[in-house]
């Protein structure tokens, strides 16, 4: 097995990760002899419930602030035996004063799931927390509430990058978070493959995630680390926007060099086609849309047979770690050419680097015509492909070397007939499908291109103007060093002037 441990850091990250886990749960098969194309052991772990029954829960750690978990409890139906609600007083014979918070009323969706009834349609109004549309049981060790800060607090907002750093340092000093939280899951793994981090990057969660990543690298230096860096896509007042921009700059400076993959994700995305019916004010809806692309591009990491996804990301030089997330919803009646059959990987000559997508979740412009692409990983799902037998027989390593020596972009394509399921936990009219619970075909991509250089240069300008003198030189120089690997030999000074 090649297991992955997931860390979910913050409210925005948990909205997205909840969709991710719901999708993984939907791939389970329950008929004898029916095998899922997904290897569930990659993300799920076997255990024993409170009543001795076998359990299968996500290998994940969910961090969020006080008040952010909604009705999700640390103990659930798998791990909680019924107990008498009347607690004894022990040796205390004095008067008791019991204080209780007003309980959060479970959503109708959750109540119906618990009772085995058909799930009602969700809406932006009925989803109050990410747990309102959660369909998965978690191990009690997965639920970690940080009580030092409260969700949406005006008195102590969890916004500054330094605040997240300080909180991690304090908690790690007191508890040793890796030893308490990560190690129990890691020691269960036969062959730990990677860590996957869903994390906010433009608020205090960026600082928290950066320090966590430092500790992971110290302890598990050779393991891959994939960072999905969530950032707000809506415009703010100038002062708040500058704070957000500096937080993003500090996050990418601290985490990108230590990551195997670092993907900035705008929530909501800057451009959405008219065929997508999106309420951009609803995190439930925007994260559902993002999950359709993210869950698709990560499919090769859990498909049978095993795929060396890390090699695909590294390209030929291993220099480029910042990727763009893009996707296109494909029409049902269109069949791609040059795609490999089965759950296959290919770099055949008929595969083309794609520069135009319906949705770009990293940058505002979905068009990529004028930039140089260094590496691209494409994942197509849901089609019956036209198979080019000669190209499949060609050695993939040889194909990559040909592209490298011809100064062509590194390109690897994956195909799976497993279409994307639109679950009842999704907005029912988000995608252009004729009926609810339909499946859709998606082309998603991770692309490393010279566009990243322009974004990093813009961060340098802001950092040089806003950041204090003690940190300014280190941050600006660090961003510059990262930028150089995305522009050398491909971008001129005039290109930057155009930006």
Swiss-Prot record:
<protein>
    <recommendedName>
        <fullName>Protein dml1</fullName>
    </recommendedName>
</protein>
<dbReference type="GO" id="GO:0007005">
    <property type="term" value="P:mitochondrion organization"/>
</dbReference>
<dbReference type="InterPro" id="IPR029209">
    <property type="entry name" value="DML1/Misato_tubulin"/>
</dbReference>
<dbReference type="InterPro" id="IPR049942">
    <property type="entry name" value="DML1/Misato"/>
</dbReference>
<dbReference type="Pfam" id="PF10644">
    <property type="entry name" value="Misat_Tub_SegII"/>
</dbReference>
<dbReference type="GO" id="GO:0005739">
    <property type="term" value="C:mitochondrion"/>
</dbReference>
<comment type="function">
    <text>Involved in the partitioning of the mitochondrial organelle and mitochondrial DNA (mtDNA) inheritance.</text>
</comment>
<dbReference type="InterPro" id="IPR036525">
    <property type="entry name" value="Tubulin/FtsZ_GTPase_sf"/>
</dbReference>
<dbReference type="InterPro" id="IPR019605">
    <property type="entry name" value="Misato_II_tubulin-like"/>
</dbReference>
<dbReference type="Pfam" id="PF14881">
    <property type="entry name" value="Tubulin_3"/>
</dbReference>
<comment type="similarity">
    <text>Belongs to the misato family.</text>
</comment>
<keyword id="KW-0496">Mitochondrion</keyword>
């Amino acid at each position: 097995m090649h297991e992955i441990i997931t860390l979910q850091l913050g409210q925005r990250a948990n909205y997205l990760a909840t969709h991710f886990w719901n999708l993984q749960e939907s791939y389970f098969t329950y008929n004898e002899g029916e095998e899922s194309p997904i290897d569930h052991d990659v993300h799920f772990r076997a255990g024993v419930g409170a009543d001795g029954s076998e359990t299968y829960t996500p290998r994940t750690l969910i961090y969020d602030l006080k008040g952010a978990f909604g009705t999700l409890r640390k103990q659930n139906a798998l791990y909680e035996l019924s107990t008498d609600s009347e607690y004894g007083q022990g040796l205390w014979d004095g008067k008791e004063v019991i204080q209780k918070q007003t309980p959060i009323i479970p959503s109708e969706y959750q109540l119906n799931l618990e009772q085995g009834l058909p799930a009602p349609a969700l809406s932006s109004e009925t989803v109050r927390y990410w747990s309102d549309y959660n369909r998965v049981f978690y191990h009690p060790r997965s639920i970690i509430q940080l009580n030092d800060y409260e969700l949406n607090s005006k008195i102590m907002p969890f916004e500054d990058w330094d605040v997240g750093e300080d909180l991690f340092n304090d908690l790690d000093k007191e508890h040793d978070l890796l030893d308490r939280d990560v190690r129990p899951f890691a020691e269960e793994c036969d062959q730990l493959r990677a860590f996957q981090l869903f994390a906010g990057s433009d608020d205090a969660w960026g600082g928290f995630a950066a320090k966590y990543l430092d500790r992971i690298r110290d302890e598990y230096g050779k393991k891959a680390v994939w960072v999905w860096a969530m950032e707000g896509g809506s415009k703010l007042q100038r002062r708040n926007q500058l704070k957000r921009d500096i937080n993003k700059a500090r996050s990418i400076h601290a985490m990108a060099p230590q990551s195997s993959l670092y993907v900035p994700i705008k929530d909501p995305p800057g451009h959405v086609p008219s065929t997508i019916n999106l309420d951009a004010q609803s995190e439930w809806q925007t994260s559902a849309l993002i999950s359709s692309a993210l869950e698709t591009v990560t499919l090769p990491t859990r498909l049978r047979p095993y795929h060396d996804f890390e090699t695909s990301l590294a390209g030929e030089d291993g220099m480029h770690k910042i990727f763009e997330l893009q996707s296109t919803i494909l029409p049902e009646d269109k069949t791609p050419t040059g795609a490999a059959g089965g759950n296959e990987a290919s770099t055949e000559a008929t595969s083309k680097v794609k520069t135009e997508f319906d949705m770009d979740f990293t940058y505002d412009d979905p068009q990529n015509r004028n930039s140089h692409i260094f590496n691209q990983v494409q994942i197509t799902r849901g089609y019956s492909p036209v198979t080019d037998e000669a190209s499949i027989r060609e050695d993939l390593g040889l194909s990559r070397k040909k592209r490298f020596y011809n100064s062509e972009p590194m390109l690897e394509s994956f195909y799976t007939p497993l279409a994307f399921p639109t679950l009842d936990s999704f907005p029912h009219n988000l995608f252009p499908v004729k009926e609810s619970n339909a499946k859709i075909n998606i082309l998603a991509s991770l692309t490393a291109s010279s566009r990243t250089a322009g974004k990093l240069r813009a961060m340098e300008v802001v950092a040089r103007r806003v950041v204090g003198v003690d940190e300014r030189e280190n941050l600006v120089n660090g961003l510059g060093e990262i930028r150089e690997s995305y522009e050398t030999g491909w971008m001129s000074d005039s290109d930057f002037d155009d930006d």
